[in-house]
Amino acid sequence: MGTLARLAPGFLEKLSESHHMSATEKEESFMYMLGHNCIHVMNSPAAGKLYGQGLFEVENKRPIFRYEHLFFTVLDAYRPAKSHWTLKAPVYALFFPLIFDEYPDVRLVLTHRNPLVTLPSVCRLMESWCIAFDKDGSFDKHRFAKLQRIAAEKIIMVPFQFRKGNPDKEGQIFDCLYAELFSDPITIVKKIYEKFHIRYTGEFEQRMKVYLEDNKQGKYGRHKYSLEEYGFDVQSLYQEFKEYMDHYGYGIPDKMVRPVALGSEKALG
């Protein structure tokens, strides 16, 4: 962290507005250890179409899933999990079919949010990573956003199409809508545990309440972003994601408004 702060002054502070990192956030340690922190998309728009095609191809990622499974098998043999292993990474969605091939008994929480809201947010997050390592003024937001648009389409539609063709897997999948999670996170966690028959305790719930109280949204600042900033046309995006958006009841938002949190009187802008 100290080295990065010296090499790119202001980078960590800006990134923390959208994705807080600290020595206590264990998932960040795992992401770095596994080389998983989206390094492959940093400046890949400059790598050409062939790189992009290979990046999102499903079948050639099978060895990666096999290696990961072996890694956790060895880790579990040394230090067995008390209940289960929890893996969190949005890029799993890009290669959704391989999850079930490698982990047949997987219990999967699939999160959903309006893609017209998430796309510029993801662009801003990834821009926060990239821009510190480019020459001043050389970062092309529109060019960079084209790759993020392809990634977003894959992340959304690969699981969506897989589920249409594999209804037998529905018992292993829990759909978590962002608005419901944001408005009442503890209830959603209870539903997840109930669906997958995982033990839920009062002590666990109390720890969640303490965490939520200490980590309210906006604690580390807020990012501002828009579709237009990254060269996106809202109507074009809506048509591209229409099947998915209609299925989950999403429309074109009037403005970027967050849903109302439990205990709040109004939405957060």
Protein language model annotation of sequence segments:
Residues 12-23, 69-72, 102-113, 136-144, ...:
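Short charge-dense sequence patches
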Residues 39, 91-94, 114-118, 124-125, ...:
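Short, solvent-exposed loop/turn segments at secondary-structure junctions
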